Every structure is written in C-alpha cells, then in structure tokens.
From Swiss-Prot:
Its EC number is 2.3.1.225. GO terms for molecular function: G-protein beta/gamma-subunit complex binding; protein-cysteine S-palmitoyltransferase activity. It comes from Candida glabrata (strain ATCC 2001 / BCRC 20586 / JCM 3761 / NBRC 0622 / NRRL Y-65 / CBS 138). Residues 454-504 form the DHHC domain. ANK repeats lie at residues 57-87, 92-121, 126-155, 159-188, 197-226, 230-259, 292-322. InterPro entries: Ankyrin_rpt, Ankyrin_rpt-contain_sf, Palmitoyltrfase_DHHC. Residues 1-15 have a biased composition (Polar residues). This is Palmitoyltransferase AKR1. The keyword Repeat applies. Gene3D superfamilies: Ankyrin repeat-containing domain. Its main location: membrane. It is a multi-pass membrane protein. The chain crosses the membrane at residues 308-325, 331-348, 369-389, 402-422, 498-518, 547-567.
Length: 763
C-alpha cells in the first residue's frame, strides 16, 4: 500500500509540472544555451544561436540582434529592406518580437511594434505569443507595453495558460500584482480561470510555494476550494511543497484540510508522505488548530484580554521574586523563582499567545507581545512602591529636592510610557481604491521603480523613503526607526522625539532613585560585614532592607541597557539615520559573495537602457541582467525560520549588537577582528541623509513649522507627516527623493542657522 501511495504522489507531481522550455516554448523540452556576446550582455537563444543559421543567415543575424537588444542593427536591417517586420518569423514561427520580449529588450520591442510587428503572432510548439514569452520570465515592463499596444490578455497557449497563469509561473510578484490590477480587476480574466487540467492560478502558486503570490491572489478572493482533475485543492499542492507561509495563508482563508483527493488522501496523509508534517502542523497551530485539525479551545476568548493578562504577569512575578530573595534563603528562593519563571513562560506560550489575533503569517511571540512592556511597567511599579512606602518617609526632610526631582521624573516616565504605548508613530494605511492603485503602479513603471523597494505589497501604496511596513500597526510607518518591545509599539516620525525624552528620563530617574536609596540606607545605620560591599551604605541596605536593595540593584541593571540605547539613539541622530537604516547597513556589511548584477531581492525587472529623467544617478535602480536561467523568484525555503537564542533575544531587546557594530566601525575593526582593509567600505560612509551633525540635530529636534515658538518646536512631536530634512520642510508621506547633500542653498543654510541663533540668545 505504501509503495502505491508514494507512486501516486510522484505521478501527481509529475502531471502538475507545466510544459516549459527555457527557449520560450520554441521546442517543448529543448535545452537552453545562454548567448553572451560580451561580458555585459546575456541573451536567451537556442543551440548557440537561434537554430536557423543554416537556413537563413540574414534572419539569424536579425534574431540575434533582437536577442541582444542591438537596436541599431535591427533598425538598419529593417530600414535597409533586408528583413520585413511583418514576415520575420523562422520556420517555427518565432519572430524578432518574440526574441526581444523574452530578453527584456524594451527598446527593440518598442521599435518593432511601431514598425508594424504582429503582437499576437504565435510561435513554437506551445503556440505562444510574445506576451506569453515575456510573462513567463516576469518582465513587467515588456508585458505592460505589449498590453498597451494591442496584445490580448485572454489569449491562451497550447497548454491552456493565459496571462495570469504565466505570470504566476514566473514567480515575479510584481508581474502578478500588475496583472491582478490591470487585467483581473477590470474583469478581463477571472481570478479562478482554470487551465485544461482544472488548475487555477492559486493552485499553481501553492504548488510553487510562492507565498507572496498566494497572499496577493487571496486578497483578490481567489477560491481555495477549487480542485483540479486529480481532486487536489491549493492546500493539497501547498502541502506537497511544504512552504509554511503558503499553508498558513490557505488555512487562514478557510481551506479544508480534511478534503480528500481522487486518491483518497487528505492533507495529513500527503504531509506525512512528503515529510512536511512539521510545516503543516505549524500552519495548523498558527490558525488555532491542533495537530489533528480540531480547533484549540482558547483560555481567554478576547485578544485584548489576553494581552492585558500578559502585560500584568511580570508585575506579579517581579514582586514575588523580590519578596522571595529578600525573605527566603537563596538556596531555597532561587529554584522557586526559576520554577515560577518557567511556569509563567509556559502559561503565556500555551494559553495566552494562542488567544492573540494573528495577522498574515506572523505568529505571536514573546518579543511581539506586551510581556516586555509589562516587565518595564512592573519594574517602575515596584520602584515607586518602595520609594513611597519606605524611602520617602525617611529621606524627605533631609533630601527634599532629590525626592521632588525623582517624583517629577517618575510622573513624566509613567505619563510618557502611556502616551508611547498608544501613540501614532506616523502611518499610511492600506489603499482599497483600485483606480488609485493602478495610477500608482503606472507612475512607478514610468519611473522604472516598480519593485518592492517602492511599492508595498501589504498596503498597495507607494513606499515613501525611510518607511517600513509594520504588522503590529498594519500600516506603513513613516521614518520608521524600530519596533520597541518596551513600549509595545513602533517608533516612527510622530513619536520618536517623545521616545528619546522617555529613555533619557528613565536613565535620569534611575540615577535619582539610587541617590535617594543610598541616603535611605544611610539613615538605616545598620552595622555588619557584607564581604565585597564593605560596611558602608550598601551593606546597611542589604542588611536593613533587602527588598529595597534588590529593587535598586534591578534598576541599576536596567540602567546599563538604557544607557546603551541612549548612546545608539543619539549616535543615529548625529549621523542622520534611523535604527532600521543602521540595521540595514549592518546587514549589508555582513553580505559576502553576492553578485549585485544577478541578486534581485526587490524583483526589479527594469530593462537595460530604460530612460527615466526623474532619476538621479544616485537614485536610479540598478540594472538587472536578463539571464533567464536565473528566474526571479518569490518562493522561499520550506524550512521554518530558526528561533532566537537567549543571547539573540537579549541583543534584540537591548540593541547591544548595534553598539558593537558602531564601535567596530568607529575604530576600523573588520568583521573578523582584523584591521579594516583599504578596500572595505565603512558602514557609515554611504548614508544619504547625513547632512552633518549640526543640521541632523536641527532636523530631528525642531518642528518644521517656523511660526511655532522655539520651545514648542524643540519639545513637541510633529503633529503631521511633515518634518525637517536638510533644513527644509519635507512631507514624509510623499518623500520619494532625498535632498542632495552637496547642493544646499543659501536659504536652507539660513533657515537652519536661525533657530540655533535663537538658542544661543536664550543661553
């Protein structure tokens, strides 16, 4: 039975594979050879050239020129009468337009179409049009051009594939998005159109393990219920592939994992046969199903209630820990506290996190829960508790100023923590108007910037520079700095300044608390020998009030990472970059052996020679070599991401890895500890928003409204999406180009210096 089942699965997978030949469907199953005319040219050809050199050398030369994008040769041959564009096909029907389309030669495509080339001519064993050839390799700009010049999106090849199927098969998410909005949204092609074997675009995307395409198709209401001729639904094929994100999306959209194929197999059987049980069960857990597919009963029914409980648990655990270590022997207290921590961790992970609402494929985690914010709140609570009930009565008469100072800082910290937790970091929400989205895509295509750097796949809006999508807020965060677990919110344009005041107040508050604590311990006047603590105030505190002593020690430990955070934040302000941008620079510095010409993580298929007058040399998108042996892919490994180690989580929470990176860069230490070579570029040398420390600080601390009083400009956060950048007001919601740091005008310098003069006068 097992052998028959495995054989059935193998045969089902074999039937699933499309008939694809990398020579553009010219000969089914024929091999591809990449023609390299020179080091900078990569073209798709067959058998070294175009396969017909012996038949017609002139036609062969013409087709080779179309492949290479040699517009001058193509123009000369057509205008010279050597080739007639209306009859330039070889014996297989392949035209110059086919070769130009499959090699992403938009300039040649444009010329041939203007000369009268037939955009609907079919070629090869699959009878594919130039549009099909371009779509199979994800060339968005060629597809857009051909559609605008008469190519039909509904035409199918011999396999029964239309433009939507071929776009999905290309695994270029940008082409899929383009087809969805310009073809499917207009009703030209049905989202659930099936090929002759009953397979929809969603079914193909699931089989390919293409999570981005699956998510996009589901947003367009693609059916997860339709089964092909073998009884396989998208979830069945997704289980065959085992890509976790694909499975999560499909189950989240209501796919039936109990449904059986014609071979009487459900997803559980297929997952076991394909060794994808772990990924499948992870997807089930993500959507609140147990390993058998039955709903998990939630201990807490509401998401907000579960988060409140998570937030309050550290308050109780910290109090119990301080009490235990101060009243019990350490050999008894330590194992009890460890067991309490383990039990709390197990309770949160098993009963509270499953009650959280999940968004997309992001599962709830401790780092993305209110737990860390609860630790900060609990620490502040117990610190305030001992100050009010124990320290204040002893020290107020002798240290009134110190106590009043601490009280003021404590009130500000509590108030700002509340504001930060519920603040708007500055966001752009999702766009639902398809007409506006089409306009955005069209503008990006004209500028040669239609890729994931400039277009947000989650919100369907153009990405402003320095923005980043946040799953927590389900929006693009303007001038995104980082997600801070200590406030359970993102830090961005509108709350970044308050965040800086908050962490500065925390550090000053701890320093002030330690001072009044030491005075309190001095008032206790307890004598004793405390080994390394000696017989001073610390020893008096340890003997006389261990509970308060432990809280002061805990506060000092927190002061270490807060100081690290303050240093990193002030350094970033000085350099004119955000935490997110610093992380990106660190990641870029760790990359090795990546060919920038072939590595295309942003799915950019802008043709070589694409002219965009708006682009500066610095901002222009890098050219992408059109090597069709290296398909653009939005698929990911079937393996789940590695969980954070304990040290990794500590570094993520405290930002210590950034301090290390800054120190290494400052002292010129290379990655492996050796001196930085002259060929190694500094991490911080390519910051496009670094206009000098003086200007950077003014850009950050001053509001852009010059009519506002100076003290408000310094202490208030931006009320809108506008802020200073290089001394001029910039709207971060529409920030698509940064001011050139080398061409500041006199008016910009004057506007920058005026506030500084006011500050000097005040001092």
């Amino acid at each position: 039975m097992e052998d028959n089942s495995e054989q059935a699965s193998v045969s089902s997978q074999a039937s699933m594979r499309p008939l694809v030949s990398d020579n553009g469907d010219r000969e089914a199953g024929a091999g591809v050879e990449v023609n390299i005319a020179n080091d900078n040219d990569t073209s798709v050809g067959v058998d070294g050239e175009n396969g017909n050199e012996d038949d017609d050398p002139i036609l062969s030369k013409y087709h080779n020129a179309c492949q290479r994008g040699d517009l001058e040769v193509v123009r000369e041959m057509i205008h010279g009468g050597q080739v007639n564009v209306s009859s330039d096909a070889d014996r297989e029907g392949v035209t110059g337009l086919h070769w130009a389309a499959i090699n992403n030669r938009l300039n040649v495509v444009d010329f041939l179409v203007r000369e009268g080339a037939n955009v609907e001519s079919k070629a090869g064993a699959l009878e594919a049009t130039p549009l099909h050839w371009a779509a199979r390799y994800g060339f968005v700009y060629v597809v857009d051009y051909l559609l605008q010049h008469g190519a039909s999106a509904t035409t199918t090849d011999k396999q029964g594939f239309n433009l939507l199927h071929l776009s999905v098969n290309s695994s270029n998410i940008m082409l899929v998005v383009y087809v969805l909005f310009f073809v499917v949204s207009k009703g030209i092609i049905d989202i659930d159109y099936v090929d002759p074997k009953g397979r929809t675009a969603l079914l193909w995307a699931a089989y390919q393990g293409d999570s981005l395409t699956v998510a996009a198709l589901i947003k367009f209401n693609a059916s997860v219920k339709i089964a092909d001729e073998g009884g396989f639904t998208p979830l069945h094929w997704g289980t065959v592939k085992g890509q976790p994100h694909v499975l999560k999306y499909l189950i989240q959209d209501g796919a039936d994992f109990f449904q059986k194929t014609n071979d009487n197999k459900d997803c559980f059987v297929i997952a076991e046969e394909m060794s994808n049980t772990h990924s499948f069960q992870e997807a089930l857990r993500h959507n609140n199903f147990d390993k058998n597919g039955y709903p998990i009963n939630k201990l807490v029914k509401r998401d907000d209630h579960a988060k409140i409980i998570t937030f309050l648990i550290p308050l109780l655990v910290l109090g119990f820990a301080f009490f235990g270590f101060s009243h019990l022997h350490i050999l008894f207290a330590l194992p009890v506290i460890i067991l309490l921590l383990l039990a709390s961790n197990k309770f949160i992970k098993s009963f509270l996190l499953p009650s959280y609402e999940t968004k997309g494929t992001n599962s709830a985690s401790l780092l993305k829960s209110p737990l860390i914010a609860g630790i900060l709140f609990g620490s502040i609570f117990w610190l305030a508790f001992v100050w009010i009930l124990r320290i204040l009565p002893y020290t107020f008469t002798k240290r009134p100023l110190g106590n009043l100072t601490f009280c003021a800082i404590l009130c500000f910290v509590c108030y700002s923590l509340f504001l930060l937790a519920f603040s708007d970091p500055g966001h752009i929400g999702s766009e639902n108007d398809h007409e506006k989205i089409r306009e955005t895509i069209s503008n990006l295509l004209k500028e040669g910037k239609f890729d994931t750097r400039s277009f947000c796949l989650e919100t369907w809006v153009r990405k402003p520079l320095r923005s980043k999508y946040s799953y927590l807020n389900d929006a693009l965060i303007l001038r995104f700095d980082h997600y801070c677990p200590w406030i359970y919110n993102d830090v961005g344009l509108k709350n970044h300044k308050l965040f800086i005041f908050f962490i500065l107040a925390l550090e000053l508050g701890i320093f002030s608390f330690v001072k009044v604590c030491l005075k309190y311990f001095d008032e206790l006047d307890m004598d004793g020998d405390c080994f390394i603590l000696g017989d001073d105030d610390l020893c008096s505190g340890l003997i006389g009030d261990r509970f308060t002593f432990l809280i002061m020690t805990w506060a000092c430990i927190q002061a270490v990472w807060i100081f690290s955070l303050v240093i990193v934040q002030l350094f970033q302000i000085t350099k004119g970059l955000t935490n997110s941008e610093l992380n990106a620079l660190i990641r870029e510095g760790r990359r090795v052996d990546i060919d920038s010409q072939t590595h295309n993580e942003f799915f950019n298929t802008v043709p070589e020679g694409f002219i965009n007058n708006k682009d500066t040399e610095e901002e222009a998108a890098p050219p992408v070599r059109n090597n069709t042996n290296e398909r653009i892919s939005t698929t990911f490994s079937g393996n789940l991401p590695k969980p954070r180690t304990c040290m990794g989580m500590i570094c993520a929470v405290t930002g210590l890895h950034q301090c290390v990176a800054i120190i290494k860069d400052t002292f010129g230490i290379a990655r492996h500890g050796s001196s930085r070579s002259t060929n190694t570029r500094s991490l911080l040398s390519s910051i496009s928003t670094d206009y000098g420390w003086r200007r950077n600080w003014c850009d950050f601390w001053l509001l852009s409204d010059t009519n506002t009083p100076l003290w408000k400009r310094i202490f208030f956060s931006p009320p809108s999406t506008k802020a200073l950048l290089n001394g001029k007001e910039a709207d971060y919601a529409t920030l698509y180009e940064v001011p050139n740091k080398n061409h500041g005008s006199v008016s910009q310098l004057q506007e920058l210096q005026d506030p500084l003069s006011e500050i000097d006068d005040m001092v």
